[in-house]
Design a protein with these regions (language model features):
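Structural microenvironment flanking redox-active thiols in thiol-disulfide oxidoreductases
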Residues: 84-122, 133-139
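N-proximal helix/coil linker or "cap" segments that precede and/or mark the start of modular domains
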Residues: 13-49, 63, 117-120
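Thiol-/selenol-based redox modules, centered on thioredoxin-like
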Residues: 151-181
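A short beta-strand-turn-helix
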Residues: 50-70
């Protein structure tokens, strides 16, 4: 009986881990450098500034999106749950085209050339950035696994640090309800 109970508990523990559910853990360390408490961003807080490389190898800043809502998608090419959200994200991008919202996909891929190849091969458009999951950004948002979605307002403040996935019908409803979109 003890052996059966032990096996059951170990099995439940394994299947509830991110690896078993298809999520990839990102190593996150606490940060002394940030002005934002680690993992404490909440609605209304200013998002930490970030800079990342776009698909044309130019630096892009959060400031570049001022005046628009920003739906951030943290993903990687090796993350199957992330890749599974891409068609849903593309549908939202088309649905909200011309509105005051930008969909920003930030890749955590370490190999920029591999990431660029993936973008070309899959004809991915829109704002595509890569910054190998910048630690300050991870720390500020408490990012421990991807995919992860974040919604910012037109002034770069956090609306939802744990936004719903593009595949969730609530996402479209939430975006439609944004003031001045």
């Amino acid at each position: 009986m003890f052996l059966i109970l032990t096996c059951l508990l170990v099995g439940v523990g394994y299947w509830s881990t991110p690896a078993a559910s298809g999520e990839k853990r990102i190593p996150v360390a606490t940060s002394d450098e940030g002005k934002v408490p680690v993992g404490k961003l909440k609605p209304g807080d200013a998002s930490p500034e970030f800079m990342a490389v776009d698909s044309n190898r130019r630096l892009v800043s959060l400031k570049d999106f001022k005046g628009k809502y920003v739906y951030v998608d943290l993903w990687a090419t090796w993350c199957s749950p992330c890749v599974g959200q891409i068609p849903h994200l593309q549908r939202l991008e088309k649905l909200f085209k011309g509105k005051k919202i930008v969909f920003v996909s930030i890749s955590c891929d370490e190999d920029v050339d591999e990431w660029l190849g993936y973008l070309r091969k899959n004809k991915m458009e829109g704002v595509q950035l890569n910054f190998d999951c910048n630690r300050r950004f991870q720390d500020a948002y408490g990012v421990k696994a991807i995919p992860r979605f974040i919604l910012l307002d037109k002034k770069g403040r956090v609306v939802n640090p744990n936004m719903t996935r593009p595949s969730d019908p609530e996402t479209e409803k939430t975006l439609n309800a944004l003031k001045g979109i």
